[in-house]
């Protein structure tokens, strides 16, 4: 098969792959609200925990499970978790996980009719090309939430957004799955003229998977 035919076949497949399902416009996607909006805190230092409130032994006991993959008490040596600074070509070379079913199950014989069928080698080549183009990696970086959270450093995920993930352009990488980790938050409430403060557990969402989806 000559190269122009290969490009035509790939383009037709991408056109079908990039079609936005109509129900995406009717049904909200739960993870669209990730990541969290920027937290707004009162800047008055009276609401900050004091040194005696930051006993690590007591806080670890109150927190329970401490997942060091996503949590750090002190500033991590490597603020970026390995893939934030990678360029587009390097990201595409680091395909991870299982090949998406919608790419794996594409009918590569349709553009050629019943008499001619694409070879296994060509099918694999097209699958890998489509996968690398529509690949949506999760980029992890450490965020400092401030002294009113413990641990204050969280490894948060975001989706790659430097280019569209479809041809024609229009689809973008968006959060598809997430998990939650438990943090402690310093909460102060005014009661009877006095300020009462304590550490309370809160759930913080972490993006774990991104997917090529409709922009709207």
Swiss-Prot record:
For this protein, the record's InterPro entries field holds:
Cystine-knot_cytokine, Noggin
Among the GO biological process terms of this entry, one is: dorsal/ventral pattern formation
Tell me the keywords, alphabetical order: Chondrogenesis, Developmental protein, Differentiation, Disulfide bond, Glycoprotein, Secreted, Signal
- The UniProt entry lists the main location of this chain as secreted
According to its UniProt record, what is one Pfam family this protein matches? Noggin
The UniProt entry, under Gene3D superfamilies, shows: Cystine-knot cytokines, Helix hairpin bin
The keyword S-adenosyl-L-methionine belongs to this UniProt entry's keyword annotation: no
Any Gene Ontology CC annotation: extracellular space
Cellular localization per UniProt: Secreted
Record: glycosylation sites? 55
Signal as UniProt keyword: yes
Task: Tell me the function of this protein.
Answer: Inhibitor of bone morphogenetic proteins (BMP) signaling. May play an important role in the dorsoventral patterning of the embryo.
Give the family this protein belongs to, as stated in its UniProt record.
Belongs to the noggin family.
What this protein is called in its record is Noggin-1
Record organism: Danio rerio
């Amino acid at each position: 098969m000559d190269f122009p035919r290969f490009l035509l076949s790939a383009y037709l497949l991408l056109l079908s792959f990039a079609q936005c399902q109509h129900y995406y416009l009717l049904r909200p996607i739960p993870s669209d609200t990730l990541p969290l909006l920027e937290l707004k805190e009162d800047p008055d230092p009276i609401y900050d925990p004091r040194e005696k409130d930051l006993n690590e032994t007591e806080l670890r006991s109150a927190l329970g499970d401490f997942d060091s993959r996503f949590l750090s008490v002190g500033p991590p040596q490597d603020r970026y978790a390995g893939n934030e600074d990678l360029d587009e070509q390097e990201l595409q070379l680091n395909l991870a996980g299982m090949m998406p079913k919608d790419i794996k199950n594409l009918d590569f014989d349709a553009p050629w009719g019943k008499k001619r069928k694409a070879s296994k080698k060509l099918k694999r080549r097209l699958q890998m090309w489509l996968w690398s183009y529509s690949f949506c990696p999760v980029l992890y970086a450490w965020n400092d939430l401030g002294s009113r959270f413990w641990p204050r450093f969280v490894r948060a995920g975001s989706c790659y957004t430097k280019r569209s993930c479809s041809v024609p352009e229009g689809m973008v990488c968006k959060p598809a799955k997430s998990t939650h980790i438990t943090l402690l938050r310093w909460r102060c409430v005014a009661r009877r003229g006095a300020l009462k403060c304590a550490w309370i557990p809160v759930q913080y969402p972490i993006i774990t998977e991104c997917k090529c989806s409709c922009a709207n």
